[in-house]
Amino acid sequence: MADLASRITKPDEVAAETPAETPAETAPAASGELGQADGNIEDLGGSGLQEPEWDVEVSLSELQNNEATPFHSATTWQDLGLREDLLKGLLSLNFLKPSKVQGKSLPLMLSDPPRNMLAQSQSGTGKTAAFVTAILSRVDFSKPDQPQALALAPSRELARQIEGVINAIGRFVENKKVAAAIPGVLPRGEPVRASVIVGTPGTVMDIIRRRQLDISQLRVLVLDEADNMLDQQGLGDQCLKVKNMLPKEIQVLLFSATFPENVMKYAGKFAPNAHSLKLQRSELTVKGISQMFIDCPDDNMKYDILCKLYGLMTIGQSVIFVKTRDSASEIERRMVADGHKVSALHAAFDGAERDNLLTKFRQGENKVLITTNVLARGIDVSSVSMVINYDIPMKGRGDTEPDAETYLHRIGRTGRFGRVGVSISFVYDKKSFDALSKIAEMYGIDLVKLDTEDWDEAEERVKEVIKKNRAQASYAPSATEPKAAAGA
């Protein structure tokens, strides 16, 4: 296996290269073609989302028995036969046409009789909007108090985000009721009166056992970040217990950016006879993210280098990923003491604090967030221009092997919706160096080394990418903030 040195692109080589995608090429021309984008609709066209260059590979289980069975991909929302109130909601968010993943997955998810689905696609390609549209299409809103759809997420932050997307896309749906089944929200003993429930597996399992949630008419179950939930022993057990409590005919939809082979096999049993949308490993990493690394002299020097990067972090917004809660809190304490404005967010905070911290970050009140893997997956803040891997993600007993999937999810917090972004990973010893080397080899990443001996050049290199990110801000669709009406 090639070591990290063979994956490194020297800075002078980068400067000499012509970028594969310039901002002008990435940003669609104003051609009148409808697309998913924010900003002035008259000036924008195309998708605006991170669109894979590959055509989505769709494996249809029925083709095993009948090779002539056709399937189609929607090119407009109207092709899907969606309700007018859903169309209105999608258009109000500038989701003007389906992304590739949405166009491939929605006809399959909405087919009758309902079929299970396992869908894999890069971060920022519109997976959440896809399964939310499917959920809202399956629910009978003439029965607003009857639970009919259940979405599970690995963290309260992601559950809250999905809840927000449901409310945004369904903003024009009459009698829509959505409930969050996360710790500290639902009154104990009171029945859940909502047609759509979004929650974490443990809380959902508890309210089913306490008979607060009527599961008799649930039609669809969604697992977002499904590989993470099915692979973790605790979450996987909870998800399986929840599924076994639900009606046997329920439609199961599994979504994630990554599906390791061992999880894929289990997912196939969790959602049998499923349609499958899959990516090749080489297409998993997001090309719009400039992936860099810094070789720190030792573990203690990582903090000093982090502080030197602070000015770059606040050009846009940044997320710093660390291994432990204690590390997050300690780095926050030291940076605040050194005069930097940062916030830490991890699972040791109570639910209300976590909700408040993430809201402030979304609104731009906090520019820099220090966190653990609790925010590695699914969280969508389109203005994040930089991700820092203060600690390389590891897994296995004793952290013996690199966690390549978590690395991919972490850096996917930037480069959202086709915008560019920067990820910077800190290495300081042979173990961290080798771990990043293996991740780079696995995904075919060409890493750029930032020279700490010449900070001016390093800063210019990072700043160039971040400014491109900000220049593309008008191309980022928001699933929670509608475009302001003309003249508003």
From Swiss-Prot:
GO molecular-function terms, A-Z: ATP binding; ATP hydrolysis activity; RNA binding; RNA helicase activity
Subcellular location: Cytoplasm; Nucleus, Nuclear pore complex; Nucleus membrane
Catalytically driven reaction(s): ATP + H2O = ADP + phosphate + H(+)
Coiled coil: none
Main location (coarse class): cytoplasm
Annotated ranges, domain Helicase C-terminal: 305-466
Residues binding ATP: S121, Q122, S123, G124, T125, G126, K127, T128
Known EC number: 3.6.4.13
Signal peptide: none
Source organism superkingdom: Eukaryota
Residue ranges, annotated region (Disordered): 1-49
Annotated disulfide bonds: none
Entry membrane topology: Peripheral membrane protein
Stretches with biased composition (Low complexity): 16-30
Function: ATP-dependent RNA helicase associated with the nuclear pore complex and essential for mRNA export from the nucleus. May participate in a terminal step of mRNA export through the removal of proteins that accompany mRNA through the nucleopore complex. May also be involved in early transcription.
Domain description: The Q motif is unique to and characteristic of the DEAD box family of RNA helicases and controls ATP binding and hydrolysis.
Family to which this protein belongs: Belongs to the DEAD box helicase family. DDX19/DBP5 subfamily.
Quaternary structure and partners: Associates with the nuclear pore complex.
Protein name: ATP-dependent RNA helicase DBP5
The gene coding this protein: DBP5
